[in-house]
């Protein structure tokens, strides 16, 4: 109980005392759900409903009118609209997929088929030969089973972007400077490759042998590429550029196998329709074309990063 003459009230911080209700007429004073936060915007209980809930309920549901701190409380209205809500890590790699795209538009996307960067130096040649060796192994192991091929290889395809983004992120932190949009570009690339994996997992689940290969491949490739990037980051980007060239070739062959009837053209998974804004009638071949366009974008991004003669982690080509 607080008395009328109690000096404690005068010493209470303003941000706490606003939660006390003092009666000047009565000797006794009552509490009205004392605020528990010491920062601005603190939530406190009043009549069983939090202040934050009251603010949230009073706002319009249009994301453009809701203050940024409250936007993450709003759930998407559409059933499968999560990819349209996420910004940053959920963005598509190509602007064509930021809006609904028709199957004809998808088919006519210019991904510059056959585009190849001719090695200009010893490091470029070194990166190219490594990729050709990896391609030979993949061809020998998977043959023309392209669904299995992409499920396994997309598990390692998502590693380079994350490693490159991590190194640039650490550079920015230790040098106390902003090195631009390259971090976001690389991390987005990694997330985009992960979406490729999740899409094809809806078509085919890997067998026991493939799962063992995936675990071993992740261990070897992650550690190997991390050392590679630490020693020669420019060459590492050239290496990824060549990897993506081979990925485009693989998806060209994947598309051809579907057209020839060697691979069943099943309905596109739900996740692919949401992620690439594909129409409801989209099929597997349309997913292949969308993924191929992404790979072409990654090819160009990594070759562009490697093209700088004065390459550094501070360099930002975007």
UniProtKB/Swiss-Prot annotation:
InterPro entries with a match to the protein in the record: AOX, AOX_sf
Presence of keyword Electron transport: yes
Domain of life the protein comes from: Eukaryota
Transmembrane segments: 150-170, 212-232
Named cofactor requirement(s): Fe cation
Record: residues binding Fe cation 1: 154, 193, 196, 295
Lipid bilayer topology: Multi-pass membrane protein
EC number(s) reported in the record: 1.10.3.11
GO cellular component: membrane; mitochondrion; mitosome
Keyword line: Electron transport, Iron, Membrane, Metal-binding, Mitosome, Oxidoreductase, Respiratory chain, Transmembrane, Transmembrane helix, Transport
Assembly and interaction partners: Found as monomers and homodimers.
Job of this protein: Alternative oxidase which function may be to reoxidize reducing equivalents produced by glycolysis such as ubiquinol.
Entry protein name: Ubiquinol oxidase
